[in-house]
């Protein structure tokens, strides 16, 4: 929704990943894109953008367009929110969206060092609570392992916060050393780091789906996936073929979804692929 613009310019991203997104900088462009997406057989849409200096994705101009998309298409609508207060959460819920995806950070120090925000970890908990109280149908927390320059700091606290809300899905990401950012040469989280995060999420949120999301290092991908499956992950974005075969060998029933890792279980049937 913001093109390549981001006021926050976090140290792990610097707006880099906005360049790979479809730009819909006006409400009319969002409606046109979603209409075309459905005509082409799309399942859903992730609506995101750069953040302002307060860590918010400025959604207010798009509320009516989001409402139109829900009323006029069959797309699953997932919105990446950033920080929200109760009023903003209620406005967003009134549009009828299906999913709110929220990045959750458990360390105040990491928030300051990486995001440059004066916010606290509890502000992310308040965002989760505001969305729940506003009755957004599905609130999906995302936790980035190694966000603080590759160090493991605050991930356990983030999971403890998330646990309070009984999420249907928890998405785990891994820091990617991104060219052109202050973190381009840091050591990313290891396969073991990712697996430990998966195991913690599985133990703390036993009823939730635990997903390895799309943003994670590609180095050591197969080993990370193997350990993640053994640790309790039940969703992996674009898994390697060997991981799929290994999961089958461990007794898992493997299903393929054409959609985002944050799709809640109750909507999975709309994204199932016939193989």
Language model segments and positions:
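Conserved functional loop/turn residues at catalytic and ligand-binding sites
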Residues: 5, 14, 41, 96, ...
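Disulfide-bonded cysteines in secreted/extracellular proteins and peptides
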Residues: 6, 10-13, 34, 214, ...
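Auxiliary Fe-S-binding modules of radical SAM enzymes
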Residues: 31, 156, 160-275
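Short Fe-S-cluster ligation motifs
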Residues: 32-51
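Conserved AdoMet/S-adenosylmethionine-binding subsite of the radical SAM
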Residues: 54-208
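Glycine-rich anion/phosphate-binding loops
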Residues: 18-32, 84, 153-157
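Conserved, mostly hydrophobic/aromatic
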Residues: 10, 47, 102, 201, ...
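Canonical Radical SAM [4Fe-4S] cluster-binding loop centered on the CxxxCxxC motif
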Residues: 1-28
């Amino acid at each position: 929704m913001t093109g390549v613009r981001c006021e926050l310019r976090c140290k792990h991203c610097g707006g880099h990943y906005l360049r790979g997104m479809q730009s819909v900088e006006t409400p009319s462009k969002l409606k046109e894109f979603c209409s075309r997406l459905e005509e082409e057989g799309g399942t859903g849409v992730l609506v995101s953008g750069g953040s302002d200096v307060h860590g918010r994705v400025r959604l207010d101009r798009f509320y009516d367009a989001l409402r139109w998309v829900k009323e006029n298409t069959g797309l699953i609508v997932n919105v990446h929110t950033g920080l929200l207060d109760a009023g903003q959460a209620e406005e967003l819920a009134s549009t009828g969206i299906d999913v709110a995806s929220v990045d959750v950070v458990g360390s105040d120090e990491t928030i300051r060092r990486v995001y440059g925000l004066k916010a606290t970890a509890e502000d992310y908990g308040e965002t989760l609570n505001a969305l729940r109280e506003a009755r957004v149908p599905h609130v999906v927390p995302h936790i980035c392992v190694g966000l603080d320059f590759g160090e493991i700091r605050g991930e356990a606290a983030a999971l403890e916060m998330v646990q309070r809300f009984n999420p249907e899905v928890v998405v785990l990401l891994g820091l990617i050393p991104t060219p052109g950012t202050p973190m381009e040469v840091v050591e990313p989280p290891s396969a073991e780091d990712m697996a430990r995060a998966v195991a913690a999420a599985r133990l703390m949120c036993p009823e939730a789906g635990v997903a390895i999301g799309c943003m994670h290092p590609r180095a050591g991908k197969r080993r990370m996936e193997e350990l993640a499956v053994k640790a309790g992950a039940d969703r992996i974005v674009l898994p390697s073929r060997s991981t799929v075969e290994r999961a089958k060998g461990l007794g898992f029933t493997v299903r393929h979804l054409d959609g985002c890792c944050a799709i809640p279980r109750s909507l999975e049937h709309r994204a199932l692929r016939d193989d």
